[in-house]
Amino acid sequence: MKPRSSRDGHNAAAAAALLLAALVLSGDVLPAVVAGGAPSFNYKDALTKSIMFLEAQRSGKLPPTNRIKWRGDSGMEDGKLANVDLTGGYYDAGDNVKYGLPLAFTVTTLAWTAMAFEKELKAARELENVHAAIRWGTDYFLKAATKKDHLWVQVGDPNADHQCWVRPENMPTPRTLYQINDKTPGSEIAAETAAAMTASSMVFRKDKPYSRRLLNKAKLLFQFAKTHQGTYDGECPFYCSYSGYNDELLWAATWLYLATKRQVYADFIGHEAISSSVAEFSWDLKFPGAQVLLAELNMTSSGGLQSFKSQADNFVCAVLPDTPFHQVSITPGGMIHLRDGANSQYVTSTAFLFVAYSDILRRINQPVMCGAQAVQPARLLQFAKQQIDYLLGANPRGRSYVVGFGVNPPTQPHHRGASTPVLPPGYQVNCGMSFSEWFTPDRPNPNELTGAIMGGPDGGDNFSDKRGNSSCTEPCTYINSLSIGPLAALAIRGPNLIATQ
């Protein structure tokens, strides 16, 4: 299997630079239209299914409310090698490893979604499901962060895991444990986990004891990340943080300031933190997310030399094709394309940030400024809708890239649990034969991975619905976590996406 780095072929310098330049053309295939010619889909159905995918990724003992009937308890001895309980959490994608960095980013973005789109999720009757998805992650983090300056960051040996194609309920592969501490730091993972726990503490404020536990742990993790600075490369080559840890430190401090309003975090944000204008928001690069959050607070970086709003604007200007500063490649069919391999994550992350930032801009009554060109919030919403619609079916192939949704949805997601039939408990899997039995055959998966958004088409809008083509067909938790907000907005606000004040 190809490593799932979101930054294949990039180095730190390239990651900090604004990415790629290209021409945009609108997609011509519109499976359904409403007045004005805009595509329309059953966004409520897509929302419900997108959340269900996260349930299919759960590790640990599943609750009675489990809606994915082909899933069962798994990883029930996780942590046993160190006499700790590390059951729970999420498998990131199509394998059976729990990676700390993408897992934490998934939870952070879910928590932001739960707050920014609370009204819409409540109206769609999905808020409780999103809360449950968040808590499934935070309960795991509380187990992983029991000691000061220490965090369990990964469960499972990815190299051994990738030699066996088996559902998590029957995996025979070692559940190797990985940790960071003051001797082996990992500022990216510690800070991202702090961000996840802080944002979640805000979501669960009505449960004061639980919220307090999350926030207290988050403060310690942020201090750990800041005091013992260093990059952890133990998740390489699968989740290498090519962008470094400055973005996670700013991101975590932003959430801590929002949660506590303590001056110590404002001082760090304004004077110590490093912030850069980039054209990507992902599990590895958080600058635009922090900048959007800080724009509403009218905060500045570098001792007041630069406005976070101007940096958030730069992100928008680099993405939109009709600004003088656009730098992001867009496929002939209209999809953002940063790189092959889970490219859909950039589609959903951009759509999410554009809707969230548009709401903020309307509240502060300001446009995006791209040099002398003013871009109104409505343009961001229009582009966000186009990106989500592309995944749902408004693309040159006229097909859905969401399992179980729309026209001609994918049937072969690159996913062990979905492609392996339900096996009896204790079934002894022959790893050497597992690929020929369940991976190689060209047939639909026996279990529907409902709501999974595929890695997506390539830069030419080409897509191969084959299990072996992981760059196209492997889903990831963070692709879906970032789709939930825009889908909720489309389902409840309607196609113009404008929130009622």
From Swiss-Prot:
Major subcellular location class: secreted
Active site location: D95, H414, D465, E474
SUPFAM superfamilies tied to this protein: Six-hairpin glycosidases
Annotated Gene Ontology cellular component terms: extracellular region
Keyword Kinase belongs to the record: no
Family: Belongs to the glycosyl hydrolase 9 (cellulase E) family.
Protein name as annotated: Endoglucanase 8
Species name: Oryza sativa subsp. japonica
